[in-house]
């Protein structure tokens, strides 16, 4: 009798531990996936206004003067090219000065409006993400009740050994889930920090855009901006695929162990694809 009571007490202890571990694991996943969908669609100004203002002040007060010096050198070099390219001054035409003045005007206009151009790129990307959010994903959350059903009733019929094995599985997978949630955090916050770093030095590559020889620097910078902006769209697609996959877990039988490991596998896949979105976006836009 006493042994039976101890066994029942131990079974209840294991069942409570399993339910607690699974609930915490799925709540953690739901929170992190929700953060992905919520934060990748933000513009740099909306994500953190303090960092945004600091980066903007640095760009306008420190980087723009440097870009002005570079622009002066680039346009002087451009003028020399325009003059000597016509058969070493033998076919000299005065119209090249008007051409040079026009190119200089455009270059100055681009450099002085770099911040507006950069923010316009991210505004367009944010608009694309916002419009796609309702189509790609409606709910990426995992319903714990749908995954395990009436878990406590099911586990009551299990033996102590089976419960102990499931408890160890839930502890291990829960620990792995915490590690994966950190990986998700690194992807999302790392991308935003990269956005701020890239936008801070925008005037310098834009200062070279008008010149034929150096213009590839500015063009590659613009492609990098587009890649960073539309990386958010690729991330949303990853989350949408993840949402469809976990729906299969929610309706897949009564195999609790399979549901746990399936959830972990899909989360590992999500982290892997999130890390790949940066390189994929750059390759699509030809940035390097």
Per-region residue spans from a language model:
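Binding/recognition "hotspot" determinant
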Residues: 1-70
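Alpha-helical transmembrane segments and their helix-start/interface "positive-inside/aromatic belt" motifs
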Residues: 2, 7-18, 92-114, 218-227
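Non-cytosolic segments of integral membrane proteins
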Residues: 14, 18, 22, 29, ...
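Alpha-helical membrane-interface segments at transmembrane helix boundaries
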Residues: 55-64, 95, 99-102, 156, ...
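Juxtamembrane "helix exit" motif at the C-terminal ends of alpha-helical transmembrane segments
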Residues: 68, 72-84, 235-250
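Hydrophobic transmembrane alpha-helix segments characteristic of membrane transport
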Residues: 70-108, 201-215
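Alpha-helical transmembrane segments
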Residues: 206-223, 251, 283-284
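Alpha-helical transmembrane segments of multi-pass membrane proteins
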Residues: 224-236
């Amino acid at each position: 009798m006493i042994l039976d009571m101890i066994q029942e007490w131990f079974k209840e202890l294991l069942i409570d531990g399993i339910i607690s571990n699974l609930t915490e694991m799925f709540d953690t996943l739901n929170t992190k996936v929700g953060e992905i969908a919520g934060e990748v669609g933000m513009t740099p100004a909306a994500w953190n206004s303090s960092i945004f203002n600091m980066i903007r002040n640095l760009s306008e007060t420190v980087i723009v003067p440097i870009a002005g010096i570079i622009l002066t050198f680039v346009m002087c070099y451009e003028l020399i090219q325009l003059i000597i390219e016509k058969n070493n001054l033998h076919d000299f035409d005065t119209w090249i000065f008007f051409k040079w003045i026009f190119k200089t005007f455009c270059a100055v206009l681009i450099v002085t409006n770099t911040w507006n151009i950069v923010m316009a790129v991210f505004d367009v990307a944010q608009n694309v993400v916002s419009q796609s959010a309702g189509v790609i994903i409606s709910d990426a959350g995992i319903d714990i009740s749908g995954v395990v059903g009436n878990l406590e009733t099911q586990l009551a019929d299990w033996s102590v050994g089976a419960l102990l094995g499931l408890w160890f599985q839930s502890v291990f997978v829960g620990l792995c889930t915490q590690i994966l949630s950190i990986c998700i955090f690194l992807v999302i916050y790392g991308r935003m920090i990269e956005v701020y770093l890239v936008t801070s030095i925008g005037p310098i590559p834009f200062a070279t855009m008008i010149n034929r020889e150096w213009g590839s620097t500015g063009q590659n910078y613009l492609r990098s901006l587009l890649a960073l902006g539309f990386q958010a769209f690729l991330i949303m697609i990853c989350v949408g695929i993840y949402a469809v996959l976990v729906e299969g877990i929610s309706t897949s039988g009564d195999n609790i162990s399979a549901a746990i490991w399936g959830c972990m596998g899909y989360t590992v896949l999500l982290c892997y694809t999130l890390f790949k979105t940066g390189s994929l976006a750059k390759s699509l836009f030809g940035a390097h």
